[in-house]
């Protein structure tokens, strides 16, 4: 997991609300790069940023080259408190996060070591089943607040995000189809200039053990195809690949990887790309919801350089 050097604001580009997928045995499903709270599985195609998520999680999730410690505690009245500290390049970044849920409202307050505070209020089933509201209010950057509406339907997933400024950035994404086949688009407009800052499109095909995705990104400048295959559900054995082509630079990037559960509590993953980067990790659930992850990265084209090693310890008593 990479250390975040600034207070990330969910909202316009939020991944809050992504349905949690069943992980392979031993694979950490509770700790994600976005720290998104768990949500009920979407009845239909989900939201746009879920296109290609299975392959991305296999290829990139839990690989890290820093050292991170996370401790989560639970109070009797339902408050969840998480303290995390990350060391990278001799710099230490820390944060403390408090979550409290009452009925359908979740209050999330996060304070970081660089004196930033982010308050996020999430309201589920806002008058209509499947409708969610997310409001993010950072401090001291009050003008960077964001509000988002997400709607999940059997045949659609729609998200509308608006920055809380006089001339905000507006982001609209939609996915239409079902759990097997869906198409979607993601568009962002800067209302201060009238310019499109993003326009992406995607296609996804899924079944219980296969996922194939095709996305057009970076305003049409890059095309990404990804593939995920759950080879054996009992052992958690899976394989995946991702190919990205840049039309402007004519450059191709190919990554492929595999994962396998050595036992119900231990998972190994490996990844390789055509630039010669090799990564591997082993993750062990040494007690319920507590994980120790050791990962390493080596540049095979510069083998004389020192390899990078990452360590993550997550404790949930």
UniProtKB/Swiss-Prot annotation:
A cellular-component GO term for this protein: mitochondrial outer membrane
Entry coiled-coil feature ranges: none
Alphabetized Pfam families for the sequence: Porin_3
Record keywords, A-Z: Ion transport, Membrane, Mitochondrion, Mitochondrion outer membrane, Porin, Transmembrane, Transmembrane beta strand, Transport
Keyword Transport: yes
Gene3D superfamilies, alphabetized: Porin (2.40.160.10)
Family: Belongs to the eukaryotic mitochondrial porin (TC 1.B.8.1) family.
Entry domain remark: Consists mainly of membrane-spanning sided beta-sheets.
Protein name as annotated: Mitochondrial outer membrane protein porin 4
Organism name: Oryza sativa subsp. japonica (Rice)
